[in-house]
Amino acid sequence: MSSRFAGGNAYQRDTGRTQLFGPADGSNSLDDNVSSALGSTDKLDYSQSTLASLESQSEEQMGAMGQRIKALKSLSLKMGDEIRGSNQTIDQLGDTFHNTSVKLKRTFGNMMEMARRSGISIKTWLIIFFMVGVLFFWVWIT
């Protein structure tokens, strides 16, 4: 499989895209291109007003970023509180379901014991409950 790709350069990226990360030989041709486009870096002479305006812009941007970070921190803290509250609610809901399950099992056991003691068969009790259910359904629909 390696012989299939050995002959061509089709799998390699073009040089414009690889220049983003620098050339493979270790030279810094990207910096040369930038410095030649802007002129020599030692010849750049910024005036005090230009430096002051750049500094003020930097301070404004840092302040804005600081405010955004504070807002994100506040939001993340509120999200954490909401998640903790939701977890507590879910735990309480699980406990409620467990308690309800225990009560239903106990009620069903008591009903089965009552049916056994009364001498009436299970089929008869099921017919009675079915008739009561049909009666409730009929009243609910009309």
Curated annotation (Swiss-Prot):
GO terms for biological process: endoplasmic reticulum to Golgi vesicle-mediated transport; intracellular protein transport; retrograde vesicle-mediated transport, Golgi to endoplasmic reticulum; vesicle fusion; vesicle fusion with Golgi apparatus. One of its GO terms (molecular function) is SNAP receptor activity. Keywords: Coiled coil, Endoplasmic reticulum, ER-Golgi transport, Golgi apparatus, Membrane, Protein transport, Transmembrane, Transmembrane helix, Transport. GO terms for cellular component: COPII-coated ER to Golgi transport vesicle; endoplasmic reticulum membrane; Golgi membrane; membrane; SNARE complex. The keyword Protein transport applies. Residues 142 are vesicular. The chain crosses the membrane at residues 118-141. It is a single-pass type IV membrane protein. InterPro entries: BET1_SNARE, T_SNARE_dom. Residues 1-36 are annotated as: Disordered. SNARE required for targeting and fusion of ER-derived transport vesicles with the Golgi complex. Component of a SNARE complex consisting of SED5, BOS1, BET1 and SEC22 or YKT6. Interacts with SEC24. This is Protein transport protein BET1. The lineage of its organism: Eukaryota, Fungi, Dikarya, Ascomycota, Saccharomycotina.
